[in-house]
Regions:
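Hydrophobic helix-and-loop "lid/oligomerization" segment in the mid-to-C-terminal part
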Residues: 1-86, 106, 124, 156-388, ...
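Mid-to-C-terminal polyanion-binding domains and interfaces
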Residues: 20, 182, 186, 261-308, ...
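Alpha-helix N-cap/helix-initiation motif
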Residues: 30, 34, 92, 137-141, ...
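Short, solvent-exposed coil/turn elements at secondary-structure transition points
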Residues: 66-68, 116, 132-134, 338, ...
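A short acidic, often aromatic-flanked loop/helix-cap motif at beta-alpha or helix-coil junctions
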Residues: 68-70, 134-137, 416-417
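Conserved phosphate-handling catalytic cores of large alpha/beta enzymes
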Residues: 77-80, 87-104, 108-178, 187
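Short, solvent-exposed secondary-structure boundary motifs
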Residues: 90, 320, 325-326, 442-447, ...
Length: 540
């Protein structure tokens, strides 16, 4: 990384000596990692130029690829937009062999900050920083924003700004699902401390206020802030730029138009939050269509579901595939029409230990225009006429149909009296995420105690989730209402669970997150009268 920073400084200083203006273009990505990484680099570079009286010798811009019309990464089209200067790629670039060659042929300097695996050939960039390249780093698990923060840390000395950029790196580290170990664990822990003290860019603080988040956790990064960052880039061709402008925005309270700028920032936060609501709706609609499509396309007995959905948006295919893989307990690939209408685009997610690229895609490579991925996820484009050929070839592959019974392993069996102590212990092991999963607990004979005459209540917009009034804290089960009611609403259960806390209006509310449950074997048998009375009380 030190070579990258020194190379950057030299390019700026050379331009200043020649009284020239250096064009600096940051090329990121349209996901949460790429947008946060771009914001980190942009703010850090602007700060460096101002602090060293070099601002008049450089023009800094950010270019995020357009999801639908351009696709991922640095392309020749983006290179065509520049005639000279310096391009810094972040969260991409290691695979852009042809585009970077074109840049070098035009005399453009290139720095790559990427965390993806390289192919056999490396691009001819001036500087490559990729922890997966041999000899680059002893820590291999940074995301793009983590690398961008390390660059910023070596470039500038402004501690206040570095703290704000660290928050962005923490959000991206969780959202990009890289392992929360080593340096990443430090980044996220420090990021959470800072944001909960109100330290972040003006845009992030506006987003947090509009989302009504109080004590922010890694779970909020992964399941609330991260999805909002991703939604604009999923739904709109150039929507990622809105998130970049939000994340990188730092308002000066001493400017005359501060109030006006703050209103605009809050309006932008409202807009991107609403887009995530739209993204959830579109995803749910696609999931609701899945059962019919599986039946219509005769997929029920396949070891891999290859689903063609004419209505699904390209931007949510990966989310849909992931949720379906969990639901049907097998790898799922979802195809949709590409926006240009000439081919199908697909996104796949695996289940269990099936390697999606090696076991499913590699044996069928002759059917694709292009494909790529790894064990857990993959993307591909295919001529529509080849879809059935691809399906039939996959059916002939030796891919195991996994054991269909859902099993959840737990770390520790506890009693009701031990549950409160778990919350204090969890603080020591947090933050949780990829590589550091939350502990799973098991409890037997957990009794429900009525609250205002009710043992449970159904919740969620569709009433499919449930809240059980257990002691010492309520238990929440996502999409578990039907399962509980089919068991005749038992008043004593065995349950695997995680502990979590909700913060609302300055108060802490402890909850148990249900993972699986069954009626306790030694539960008291209810008479029909008692069962009827219980049901009546629950719905009064």
């Amino acid at each position: 990384m030190d070579r990258a920073v020194e190379f950057f400084k030299k390019k700026v200083n050379d331009a200043a000596e020649e009284k020239e203006i250096l064009q600096i273009k940051i090329v990121g990505d349209y996901d949460a990692d790429g947008m946060n990484a771009s914001a980190i680099l942009y703010d850090a570079i602007i700060s460096y130029l101002k602090a060293n009286s070099l601002a008049e010798y450089a023009e800094v811009s950010v270019r995020l690829p357009r999801r639908y019309s351009e696709g991922y990464g640095l392309s020749k089209k983006i290179i065509d937009e520049s005639e000279s200067g310096l391009i810094i790629t972040v969260d991409n670039g290691i695979a852009a062999i042809d585009a970077i060659k074109k840049a070098k042929d035009k005399g453009i300097d290139v720095i790559i900050l990427d965390h993806h695996l390289s192919g056999e050939e490396l691009p001819c960039a001036d500087i490559i920083v990729d922890p997966h390249c041999e000899g680059m780093s002893t820590f291999k698990h940074y995301c793009g924003a983590g690398l961008a923060y390390r660059f910023a840390e070596m470039l500038i000395t402004n501690k206040d700004l570095l703290d704000k950029l660290l928050v962005l790196a923490g959000i991206a580290t969780v959202a990009d699902v890289v392992p929360l170990i080593g340096a990443n664990r430090y980044l996220v822990r420090q990021s959470l401390k800072l944001i909960n003290r109100g330290i972040a860019t003006s845009g992030v603080l506006a987003l947090v206020r509009k989302m009504r988040l109080e004590k922010i956790t890694a779970e909020d990064y992964g399941y609330k802030i991260g999805p909002v960052c991703n939604a604009s880039g999923r739904l709109l061709d150039d929507g990622a730029m809105d998130i970049f402008h939000l994340l990188s925005q730092e308002l000066d309270v001493f400017t005359l138009d501060y109030d006006e700028q703050l209103l605009k920032l809050h309006a932008l936060a409202d807009t991107v939050i609403e887009r995530n609501v739209d993204r959830r709706r579109i995803t749910e609609e696609a999931l609701e269509r899945s059962d019919a499509l599986i039946s219509q396309q005769c997929l029920a007995d396949d070891a891999v579901y290859i689903i063609y959905d004419t209505q699904v948006s390209e931007g949510v295919m990966g989310i849909v595939a992931g949720k379906l893989a969990e639901k049907y307990m097998r790898p799922v690939i979802v195809f949709a029409h590409a926006q240009d209408g000439e081919k199908l685009k697909g996104s796949g997610r695996t289940y269990g230990n099936i390697h999606l690229k090696n076991q499913v895609l590699d044996p069928c490579k002759e059917y694709f225009f292009a494909y790529g991925g790894h064990a857990g996820a993959a993307g591909m484009t295919i001529p529509e006429k080849n879809l059935m050929l691809f399906r039939n070839k996959v059916r002939k592959l030796d891919i195991p149909v996994l054991y269909r019974e859902k099993r959840i392993l737990y770390d520790l069996e506890v009693t009701k009296e031990e549950i409160p102590e778990l919350y204090e212990k969890m603080e020591f092991f947090a933050p949780f995420g990829e590589g550091n999963p939350e502990p799973v607990f098991f409890i037997r004979n957990l009794e429900l105690s009525p609250v205002r005459g009710k043992f449970y209540e159904q919740n969620g917009s569709d009433g499919k989730s449930i809240k059980l009034f257990t002691m010492p804290y309520p238990s929440s089960g996502y999409q578990m209402a039907a399962e509980y009611l089919l068991m005749d609403a038992p008043k004593k259960i065995d349950m695997t669970f995680e502990v979590y806390t909700i913060y609302s209006h300055g108060k802490e509310h402890r909850r148990l997150r249900m993972l699986d449950f069954c009626a306790s074997k030694n539960a008291e048998t209810e008479t029909s009268f008692k069962k009827g009375l219980s049901a009546m009380l629950n719905f009064m």
